[in-house]
Amino acid sequence: MLQGRNLIDPMDFSVEELEEVFSLADKIIENPKKYSKVCEGKLLATLFYEPSTRTRLSFEAAMLRLGGKVLGFSDANCSSVSKGESLEDTIKIVSGYTDVIAIRHPKEGAAEVASKHSYVPIINAGDGGHQHPTQTLTDLLTIRRIKGDFSNHTIGLCGDLKFGRTVHSLVKALSRYENNKFILISPKELKIPDYIKEFLNERNIEFKEVDKLEDVIGELDILYMTRVQKERFEDKEEYIRLKDTYVLDKEKMNVAKEDMMVLHPLPRVNEISTNVDDDKRACYFKQARFGMFVRMALIAKVLGVE
């Protein structure tokens, strides 16, 4: 039963509960009209303290397509935050007006703090470089619809694995399924955090760290590309030096498996060449579309209105 639940970390939902969300998302994809009024009279707040295109708009589109309404902000400077209002007070006020809150915040742990002060379910739409569980639901739904299941895959995660919250969440989620192996591809400056490696070691899950995509791309069933995130760097010269470390292009795709799938949480900068977009293995635009449907399912589940 997911009604009234928060989603702060991808591990907050059991495998069975995740399957409930994916099953409903599949039904919505097949017959969206059936669900077009289930959230009538309900309000979603989108509190975005950081910039967003896909996540914010897909949350808002999800609620509107369910028949609900949306309020919120996409620039904290246009709210009372600019006057010094605390996160805790903002949440107490907004949760009194609405039925569910999606929050993105630059500070790690902000969504957890919000959940302790809210009268309504909190959905973490990204907290700093920590977690991004609804992107993980999007990634998993895409894998499920294209690969059929979540087990027995070699998954390559490439790019900014240090600050890439989507990577951290996806590794944790896929570690719950059988016989998955991770290849972590990054420069030494952007290696995945130790706590994720400890998480994998504690569960005896196989992984290796490498710094060259071309050396391992032929092994992969799933390649998850990420951009190097300019906004996480204090040293802009280091960002410039690292930003084009990995570029997936046709030449590299020629070495990959015929059924490998390429995912990317978007936005991309230079890390996937546009000449890959027409490759049947490029799944990132489908992935973005599925994000709206999985958020529709999640909202319906936590509101108990399906």
Curated annotation (Swiss-Prot):
The keyword Nucleotidyltransferase does not apply. Its EC number is 2.1.3.2. It catalyses: carbamoyl phosphate + L-aspartate = N-carbamoyl-L-aspartate + phosphate + H(+). It comes from the Bacteria. InterPro entries: Asp/Orn_carbamoyltranf_P-bd (IPR006132), Asp/Orn_carbamoylTrfase (IPR006130), Asp/Orn_carbamoylTrfase_sf (IPR036901), Asp_carbamoyltransf (IPR002082), Asp_carbamoyltransf_Asp/Orn-bd (IPR006131). Keywords: Pyrimidine biosynthesis, Transferase. Carbamoyl phosphate binds at residues 54-55, 104, 132, 135, 266-267. L-aspartate binds at residues 83, 165, 227. PROSITE patterns: CARBAMOYLTRANSFERASE. The keyword Signal does not apply. Pathway: Pyrimidine metabolism; UMP biosynthesis via de novo pathway; (S)-dihydroorotate from bicarbonate: step 2/3. GO terms for molecular function: amino acid binding; aspartate carbamoyltransferase activity. SUPFAM superfamilies: Aspartate/ornithine carbamoyltransferase (SSF53671). One of its GO terms (biological process) is amino acid metabolic process. It holds the Pfam family OTCace. Belongs to the aspartate/ornithine carbamoyltransferase superfamily. ATCase family. Catalyzes the condensation of carbamoyl phosphate and aspartate to form carbamoyl aspartate and inorganic phosphate, the committed step in the de novo pyrimidine nucleotide biosynthesis pathway. Heterododecamer (2C3:3R2) of six catalytic PyrB chains organized as two trimers (C3), and six regulatory PyrI chains organized as three dimers (R2). This is Aspartate carbamoyltransferase catalytic subunit. It comes from Clostridium novyi (strain NT). The gene is pyrB.
